[in-house]
Amino acid sequence: MRIGIDCRYVRIGRHDGISRFTAGVVTNLPDRHDFVLLVNDERQLASLPDGMPWELIPAPTDAGEPLVARHVNRLGLDAVFSPMQTMGSRGRDYALVLTLHDLIYYRNRTPPREFSWPLRLGWRAFHLAWWPQRMLLNGADGVVTVSATTAGLIAAHRLTKRPVTVAYNAADPAAVRSPADGRSRTLVYMGSFMPYKNVETLVAALPLLGADWTLHCMSRVTEADRARLSALAGPGAVVFHDGASDEEYLDALRSATALVTASYDEGFGIPLVEAMGVGTPVAVSDIPIFREIGGDVAEYFDPASPSAVAAAVRRVESRWDQASAASIERAGRFRWSDSAEQVVQAVERAVEARG
């Protein structure tokens, strides 16, 4: 079978979530089919495996995206998998599997900052009702999502009549921490500073833990957010890395007591998988997606309560060696090879269903 993989969401430079998901799946595809990478810029190939066949098609932001099948039909593909749900399906002569990662933007409608104002306006309008999503998903032959939590929400909101397959998000393999790395009284937070991320509660928990605890915030931060959060904490209690490199982030994880997040809502939670994968326990808000990822290995807390955050960190500290070992085992559930296999099986079922 000849299968196209839509790689047009691969970022040039550093990955974001969709870009990393695409690259993780592509790098681990099983070898029982012929795969063709579909890109809109040759520079995207630098983030993808060498030597794979590829074709150039228009960008997903092109006005003609609803009719992109006109270009794809010429490639002689049996099927296409896209890591997004917005790939045009009209007029296609191949099986199509789309991806809906999560429904978080129906609850938190702020669009990505890098979008132009027309795209931001369209983004908000799209997420005001369910019918546009249903129209997109029902235009495919199958749908992939990255968690059982989101699969349940897709069913609850009756977003598609098509079969839904779970292909978990995962983290790239990284070296496990060693005793030589030590363990400091530091907590790591990886994520944005949007209101629903609730970073303020993490900061408010620091004085309850003690003056020797620090919170390391790894992502880029605006001056306004830096000033606001610094004012809530004592001097030096919060360290802003303002866009740490992957290696700097992993180094911080390997010496920390725990990764923490107090989000009220999340689409997934890749930082949890990244932390557990190197043997760093996690203490996180008690929401369904984090329960799915952390199982009985993570510590959970009420995200509205700084004292609950502090108590969860203390519980991690009291059983740290056991929590570290269990975290590594738990992270093994989230592997790109398994995700790629699930994607390909979804494509195979879609081709079979079309006859």
Where are these regions (language model features)?
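Carbohydrate transferase catalytic cores enriched for Leloir-type hexosyltransferases
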Residues: 1-355
